[in-house]
Amino acid sequence: MYGKIIFVLLLSAIVSISASSTTEVAMHTSTSSVTKSYISSETSDKHKWDTYPATPRAHEVSEIYVTTVYPPEEENGEGVQLVHRFSEPEITLIIFGVMAGVIGTILLIYYSIRRLIKKSPSDVKPLPSPDTDVPLSSVEIENPETSDQ
C-alpha cells in the first residue's frame, strides 16, 4: 500500500513539474481564444462604452494581451542563433542542479515516509521466549500453600 502512495507522490511531482514548464508556452500561443465580438477597435472617441459589456456573461471571453516574440530571421530564411547570458558549462550546471534538487526532494519525501512508517524500538515489545517463564528444572514442585489445606 505504501508503495502505491510513493508512486502517486512521484507521479504528481512529475506532473506538476511538466505542467509548470508548459504553462508559459501555452500563454504565448493562445491568441485566438478571444472572440471577435468582444475585441474592440481603438477609436479616438474616449466616451464610447458600447464595445465593453457592463457585466461579463458566461459565453464571452475576457481580453488577453499576449506578446509573441519570434527570433529574427536572416534573408535566406534561416533563424539567427540567440545569444544567451550563460555559457554552456553554466547552463549544464543549472540543469544538473535543478535535476539534483528534484531528485533530492523526492528522496527526502521517501525517507520521511519510511521514518513515519518504521516503528521506534520503544514501541516494539520483544516477544517473550518460552523458556523465560518456566523454571529450568523438569520436576514439578507443588505449591506448599495449597497442599497444606
Swiss-Prot record:
- Enumerate the glycosylated residues: 21-23, 29-32, 35, 37, 40, 43-44, 51, 55, 62, 68
Q: Which GO CC terms are listed, alphabetically? A: ankyrin-1 complex; plasma membrane
Q: Report the leader peptide range.
A: 1-19
The region called Disordered is annotated at 122-149
Q: Which UniProt keywords apply?
A: Cell membrane, Glycoprotein, Membrane, Phosphoprotein, Sialic acid, Signal, Transmembrane, Transmembrane helix
Stated membrane topology is:
Single-pass type I membrane protein
Question: Could you tell me which InterPro entries the record lists for this protein?
Answer: Glycophorin, Glycophorin_CS, GYPA_B
Which residue ranges run through the membrane?
Answer: 91-113
Which stretches are Extracellular in the membrane topology?
A: 20-90
For the modification Phosphoserine, the affected residues are S137, S147
Q: What's one Pfam family here?
A: Glycophorin_A
Q: Does the keyword Ligase apply?
A: no
Function, in words: Component of the ankyrin-1 complex, a multiprotein complex involved in the stability and shape of the erythrocyte membrane. Glycophorin A is the major intrinsic membrane protein of the erythrocyte. The N-terminal glycosylated segment, which lies outside the erythrocyte membrane, has MN blood group receptors. Appears to be important for the function of SLC4A1 and is required for high activity of SLC4A1. May be involved in translocation of SLC4A1 to the plasma membrane.
Q: Which family does it belong to?
A: Belongs to the glycophorin-A family.
Spell out the subunit comment: Homodimer. Component of the ankyrin-1 complex in the erythrocyte, composed of ANK1, RHCE, RHAG, SLC4A1, EPB42, GYPA, GYPB and AQP1. Interacts with SLC4A1; a GYPA monomer is bound at each end of the SLC4A1 dimer forming a heterotetramer.
Please identify the protein, giving its name as recorded. Glycophorin-A
Origin species, per record, is Pan troglodytes (Chimpanzee)
What lineage is on file?
Eukaryota, Metazoa, Chordata, Craniata, Vertebrata
Q: Which gene encodes it?
A: GYPA
